[in-house]
């Protein structure tokens, strides 16, 4: 039988049925978080600081230089930060040097100096200027003096260098150069934990990576609807800054030839040649560069030049400036400076390394030569011919031509443009024939030189982009597919944080300029020049408010892992849900091995939120790469290479399920491959690479579904998503039928404790594990009953013993939903596919009581309740058990201080912490004064503000944590907000057994609700007496096509009988032959169908039934969280109708359509009751309550409050509205007499609205009797006031 025994962790073994996967280990699955944050800490911050320093004053006389920077140690540990609701962060300090030079007239008139000694004069002048008494001369030459000056509160002395320019009778004219040093606090920066998360205000957060369009140049074509000819567009898009959009268009004046236009930042279009002219290229240069291309010649005609180069330049600059600034005018020099700033200033225009890489790839000459015939020799700088004229460039010789063109100086010429514009001045030009057949017309391909490095746009880039656009007409160059992953890149945590850091420094830069220009620089300390508040504000806003900063999905380890590996196309600078087209959401060939085609949310975000595939990594430029094994002459090599979507296009890559011998030689003659994004049947000799594993195309969650290959993709999507909602059970159990990825998923999720080095276990208990290694003794602390973001309980259990030898990377303690180092999201249960008296109609699940009694799906949930003790204007609040108007019985669980005892079982409404708040000062009554005199205690005027158990919060008090504010009296306290004296957190734990109404699912998208829990004796059982745990409806399978679950139950039953665990990796695991063999080994017959006996009748069910073991999950949609009833609760302030929703303890909304239903049945009394006393008849509902309590008849309902709201609304329009009774007298709405009943006046018996009258005697509607009621147009009067 074709399997290997795979040791997973601590002696756990699985039969591994994989057939083709190589030996390539999975990369660290959370590398996308940890690696990029490490880059940000070491290089990212450095890049930004070097970009902004030196900072100068407005007149550039004073400058701040960067000397160095460091991130100090974190103030508290991540666990302490969680406990105290703090941020896990560390301070950043930057060392700066301030330099400035001024020319000063130094007076010699110092009273105490009799002989005018220059040294003393200068020394006294410095002392006066700096308010410092510590001025000492270091050294001096002929007329240069160096002084050391110690300012109060600075570590390093200031250095004054005074050069005497001229000495007169009473003054010295000198140049004063000053250097000051100082360390500036740049704020606290959140740090990443080892698990790839941030602790922000006590909660774990994850920064989701963003998938955005890569900077670079993009080309497309469209058909002009009027003329039917092709128009070409080319854009240069930066990461930050101005967009340039080139397009060809037919001007009305010209007959046929297109002209070329450009739009700068979506402004009105202008001719591309006038744009090139303002950059300093003259008419002849432009014609020379493009070899008098017909489109360029036509475009130049539209420029209306006079022939005077400077005048034409000034005119074009001002015209373009007007278009960008929408009609504003400026001098030609001012306009030119503005336009140059937009494009060539590194601070305003950022192409990034990725953008330069894409431009280099797109605009290089060598990348446009494929399939063309050269119209000239390619020669090097000395004139030696490298490639001869008339050579056709094909796949065979493209590498040779590329190598030739990559050499320095090959086919390179220089262009001249404005001196004040930075960047390369060299272009590469190669002539090819426009048409390979006729060879009469040539086209000059103009490109950038192979060694451009600038991270801003250059004139050469613009020139080459225009050339690319012109070549498209002759099929030279390619159009871009913006959905290809070659054109999309990932902004990871590091880059997102670097961008925020840059934004903060931009704000600081403005403040520093102002401060350097206005401060007295002699007295200023370097540490006071920079205020880091703008930076910390930007960072704080990002972590707290950004769309990309999310609460970590902490239901189970898989949810955590997926959250860290998620890619979103939404967020700032990304797409928006409403405008995203189907093409963007769709699966693209370039996703192969990079983005999972299956795991994505259902609903409006489908296709916009994706997940990295299992082997995918993100490179330093942000492009996603996937590994392939090399194939040479049909033999698979043992070395792999990570390829980007761009590089992959050039190779023929085979799928991994080829037949091969033990040496890796492929035995098939032809293999299914992909080439240039399409399927391709290749000869073995053509294949260059092969997939490393069949699971490389799917994500971690998807690859955890066994028999994925037998499931419909829609159901697999649900299966992958629902695994993330599985609640950890008390005793986790790993699946009998796994896929082999369970260990890696658990190890990298961050919930387990993983050994960092080899060693021997010296001590183990429930709180810590001590390991002795070569580096010394290391203690690992275990989490015990900690609350996760989702309210589940985090408990880590040691799985090693004292004396065990462990290796680095081994799991030594399981987390939630982990069993012996393997992911264990659910439980293995015996499942039968049969109906049961209609109880499993519509996917409902029938369950045996045995499952509940054995606590298989019991989970633990922890809720946190927080109480703050504040200092109010009336005085400090107090924690006490002496709460006014509360019985002793209600306080029996409180200790002397008023805090509930740990271990107490509490119900809704019970007091957890007694707290009283002082009311305003009140005058004591004579009785109070008497009591006070007798008992000597103040009868306190306080209000009960205790913390009580909310609706549905009952459980057992697990722990209580108290945090007192730091003060002189309490130096060990923690920093709390102003006015908060103490924070008390009470944790209540609930043990939830599975019950009717809970949602369950398998791993194949087969979900349902438990409809019935049956006693064990009523459940069907096998002939040997084995009771079935769960009954599923067989009708749920055919239409959904998730056949994987059938294979899983048969394999699961076989595994249970054999007492083994099995790994069947996706696309390469157990096939039908293997399954037959395993079932035969386990002694199973009849394709796994068995005779099932009805527990109630004891008779066998007619037909054999499929029974097996399935891995089932309990999902986090539990009936306890959803079921809700209201007896007494809050009302809306305006309409006085009950609020809605469980959180508000609200009522059921009886809306417009429900009213129609009762009207249809003519249930008038019920309807009146619902719309009045059960809703918003204020007095009526009070009277009704009294009547019920006193066993009286329920009074007649009054007028609902919504009618009052309506009448007030009408009054607001300027009308006076009131009720008239039968006799024409005004009457009050909702008038009650003293007998607790409605007024018994005959005329008001029904409190009906007989006439609505307005002061201006316009009668809106008259209701004389019920017959006339039908004539009223319903659209004119609508007295129902509803609140969503």
From Swiss-Prot:
Catalysed reaction equations from the record: RNA(n) + a ribonucleoside 5'-triphosphate = RNA(n+1) + diphosphate
Alphabetical UniProt keywords: DNA-directed RNA polymerase, Nucleotidyltransferase, Transcription, Transferase
Family: Belongs to the RNA polymerase beta chain family.
EC number annotated for this UniProt entry: 2.7.7.6
Lineage: Bacteria, Bacillati, Mycoplasmatota, Mollicutes, Entomoplasmatales
One Pfam family here: RNA_pol_Rpb2_1
GO cellular component terms given for this protein: DNA-directed RNA polymerase complex
Superkingdom to which the source organism belongs: Bacteria
Coiled-coil stretches: none
PANTHER family: DNA-DIRECTED RNA POLYMERASE I SUBUNIT 2
Subunit structure comment from the entry: The RNAP catalytic core consists of 2 alpha, 1 beta, 1 beta' and 1 omega subunit. When a sigma factor is associated with the core the holoenzyme is formed, which can initiate transcription.
GO MF, one example: DNA-directed RNA polymerase activity
Name of this protein: DNA-directed RNA polymerase subunit beta
GO BP: any one term: DNA-templated transcription
Free-text function comment from the UniProt entry: DNA-dependent RNA polymerase catalyzes the transcription of DNA into RNA using the four ribonucleoside triphosphates as substrates.
């Amino acid at each position: 039988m074709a399997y290997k025994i795979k040791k997973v962790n601590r002696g756990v073994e699985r039969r591994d049925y994989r057939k083709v996967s190589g030996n390539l280990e999975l990369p660290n699955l959370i590398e996308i978080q940890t690696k990029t944050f490490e880059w940000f800490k070491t290089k990212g911050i450095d890049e930004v600081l070097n970009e902004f320093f030196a900072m100068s004053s407005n007149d550039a006389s004073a400058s701040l230089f960067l000397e160095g920077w460091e991130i100090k140690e974190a103030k508290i540990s991540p666990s302490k930060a969680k406990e105290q609701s703090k941020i896990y962060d560390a301070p950043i300090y930057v060392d700066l040097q301030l330099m400035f030079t001024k020319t000063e007239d130094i007076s010699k008139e110092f009273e105490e100096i009799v002989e005018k000694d220059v040294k003393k004069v200068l020394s006294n002048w410095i002392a006066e200027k700096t308010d410092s008494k510590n001025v000492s001369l270091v050294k001096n030459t002929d007329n240069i003096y160096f002084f050391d000056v110690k300012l109060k509160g600075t570590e390093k002395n200031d250095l004054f260098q005074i050069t005497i320019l001229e000495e007169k009778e009473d003054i010295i004219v000198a140049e004063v150069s000053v250097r000051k040093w100082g360390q500036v606090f740049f704020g606290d920066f959140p740090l990443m934990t080892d698990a790839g998360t941030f602790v922000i205000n006590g909660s774990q957060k994850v920064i989701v990576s963003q998938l955005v369009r890569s900077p670079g140049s993009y080309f497309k074509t469209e058909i002009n609807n009027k003329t039917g000819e092709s128009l070409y567009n080319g854009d240069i898009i930066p990461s930050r800054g101005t967009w340039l959009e080139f397009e060809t268009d037919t001007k009305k004046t010209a007959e046929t030839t297109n002209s070329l236009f450009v739009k700068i930042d979506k402004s009105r279009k202008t001719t591309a040649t006038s744009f090139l002219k303002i950059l300093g290229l003259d008419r002849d240069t432009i014609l020379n560069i493009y070899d008098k291309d017909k489109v360029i010649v036509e475009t130049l005609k539209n420029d209306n030049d006079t022939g005077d180069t400077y005048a034409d330049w000034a005119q074009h600059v001002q015209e373009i400036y007007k278009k960008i600034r929408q009609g504003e005018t400026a001098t030609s020099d001012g306009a030119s400076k503005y336009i140059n700033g937009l494009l060539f200033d590194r601070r305003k225009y950022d192409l990034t390394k990725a953008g330069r890489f894409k431009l280099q790839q797109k605009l290089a000459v060598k990348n446009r030569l494929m399939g063309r015939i050269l119209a000239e020799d390619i020669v090097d700088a000395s004139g030696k011919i490298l490639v001869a004229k008339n050579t056709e460039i094909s796949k065979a010789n493209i590498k040779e031509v590329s190598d030739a063109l990559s050499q320095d100086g090959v086919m390179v010429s220089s262009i001249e443009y404005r001196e004040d514009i930075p960047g390369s001045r060299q272009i590469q030009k190669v002539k090819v024939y426009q048409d390979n057949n006729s060879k009469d017309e040539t086209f000059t391909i103009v490109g950038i030189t192979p060694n451009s490095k600038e991270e801003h746009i250059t004139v050469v880039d613009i020139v080459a982009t225009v050339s690319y656009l012109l070549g498209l007409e002759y099929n030279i160059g390619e159009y871009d597919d913006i959905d290809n992953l070659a054109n999309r890149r990932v902004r990871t945590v590091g880059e997102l944080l670097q961008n925020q850091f840059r934004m903060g420094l931009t704000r600081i830069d403005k403040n520093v300029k102002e401060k350097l220009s206005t401060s007295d620089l002699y007295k200023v300390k370097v540490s006071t020049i920079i205020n880091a508040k703008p930076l910390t504000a930007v960072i704080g806003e990002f972590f707290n408010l950004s769309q990309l900063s999310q609460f970590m999905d902490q239901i189970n380890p898989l949810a955590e892992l997926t959250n860290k590996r998620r890619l979103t196309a939404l967020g700032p600078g990304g797409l928006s849900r409403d405008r995203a087209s189907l093409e963007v959401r769709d699966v693209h060939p370039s996703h192969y091995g990079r983005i999972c085609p299956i795991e994505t949310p259902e609903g409006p975000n489908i296709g916009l939120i994706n997940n990295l595939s299992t082997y995918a990594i993100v490179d330093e430029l942000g492009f996603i790469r996937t590994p392939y094994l090399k194939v040479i002459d049909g033999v698979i090599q043992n070395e792999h290479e990570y390829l980007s979507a761009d590089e992959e296009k050039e190779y023929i890559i085979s799928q991994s399920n080829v037949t091969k011998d033990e040496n890796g030689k492929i035995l098939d003659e032809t293999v299914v491959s992909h080439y240039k994004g399409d399927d391709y049947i290749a000869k073995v000799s053509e294949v260059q690479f092969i997939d490393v594993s069949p699971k490389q195309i799917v994500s971690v969650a998807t690859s955890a579904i066994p028999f994925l290959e037998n499931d419909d993709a829609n159901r697999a999507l649900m299966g992958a998503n629902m695994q993330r909602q599985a609640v950890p059970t008390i005793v986790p159990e790993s699946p009998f039928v796994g896929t082999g990825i369970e260990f890696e998923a658990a190890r990298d999720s961050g919930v387990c404790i993983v050994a960092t080095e080899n060693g021997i276990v010296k001590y183990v208990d429930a709180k810590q594990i001590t390991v002795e290694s070569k580096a010394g003794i290391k203690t690992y602390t275990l989490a015990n009953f900690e609350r996760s973001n989702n309210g589940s309980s985090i408990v880590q259990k040691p799985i090693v013993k004292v004396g065990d030898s462990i290796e680095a990377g081994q799991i030594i303690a399981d987390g939630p939903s982990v069993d012996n180092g393997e992911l264990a999201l659910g439980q293995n249960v015996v499942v039968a596919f049969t109906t049961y008296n209609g109880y499993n109609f519509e996917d409902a699940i029938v369950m045996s009581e045995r499952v509940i009694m054995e606590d298989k799906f019991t989970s633990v949930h922890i809720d946190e309740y927080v109480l703050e003790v504040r200092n109010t204007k009336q005085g400090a609040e107090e924690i006490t058990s002496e709460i006014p108007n509360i019985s002793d019985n209600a306080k029996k669980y409180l200790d002397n201080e008023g805090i509930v005892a740990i271990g107490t079982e509490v119900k809704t409404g019970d007091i957890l912490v007694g707290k009283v708040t002082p009311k305003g000062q009140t005058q004591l009554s004579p009785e109070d004064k008497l009591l006070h005199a007798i008992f000597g205690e103040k009868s306190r005027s306080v209000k009960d503000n205790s913390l009580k158990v909310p609706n549905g919060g009952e459980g057992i008090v697990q722990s209580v944590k108290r945090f007192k504010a730091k003060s002189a009296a309490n130096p060990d306290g923690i920093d709390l907000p102003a006015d908060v004296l103490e924070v008390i957190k009470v944790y209540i734990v609930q043990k939830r057994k599975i019950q009717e109404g809970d949602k369950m699912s398998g791993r194949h998208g087969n979900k349902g609700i438990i409809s019935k829990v049956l006693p064990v004796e009523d459940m069907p059982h096998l002939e040997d007496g084995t009771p079935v745990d769960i009954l599923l409806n067989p009708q749920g399978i055919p239409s959904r096509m998730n056949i994987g679950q059938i294979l899983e139950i048969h394999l699961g039953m076989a595994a249970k009988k054999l007492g083994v665990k099995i790994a069947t990796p996706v696309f390469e695991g157990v096939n039908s032959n293997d399954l037959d063999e395993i079932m035969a080994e386990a002694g199973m017959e009849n394709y796994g169908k068995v005779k099932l006996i009805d527990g109630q009748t004891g008779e066998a069910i007619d037909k054999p039934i499929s029974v097996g073991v399935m891995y089932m999950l309990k999902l986090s949609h539990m009936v306890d969280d959803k079921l809700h009833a209201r007896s007494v609760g809050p009302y809306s302030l305006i309409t006085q109708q009950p609020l809605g929703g469980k959180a508000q303890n609200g009522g059921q909304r009886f809306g417009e359509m429900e009213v129609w239903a009762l009207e249809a049945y003519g249930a008038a009394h019920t309807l009146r009751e619902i719309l009045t006393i059960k809703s918003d008849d204020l007095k009526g509902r009070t009277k009704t309550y009294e009547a019920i309590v006193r066993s009286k008849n329920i009074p007649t309902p009054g007028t609902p409050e919504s009618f009052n709201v309506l009448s007030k609304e009408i009054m607001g329009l300027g009308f006076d509205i009131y009720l008239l009774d039968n006799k024409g007298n005004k009457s009050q709405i909702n008038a009650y007499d003293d007998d607790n009943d409605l007024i018994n006046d005959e005329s008001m018996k029904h409190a009906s609205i007989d006439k609505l009258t307005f002061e201006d005697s316009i009668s809106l509607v008259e209701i004389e009797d019920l017959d006339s009621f039908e004539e009223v147009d319903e659209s004119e009067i609508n007295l129902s006031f509803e609140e969503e």
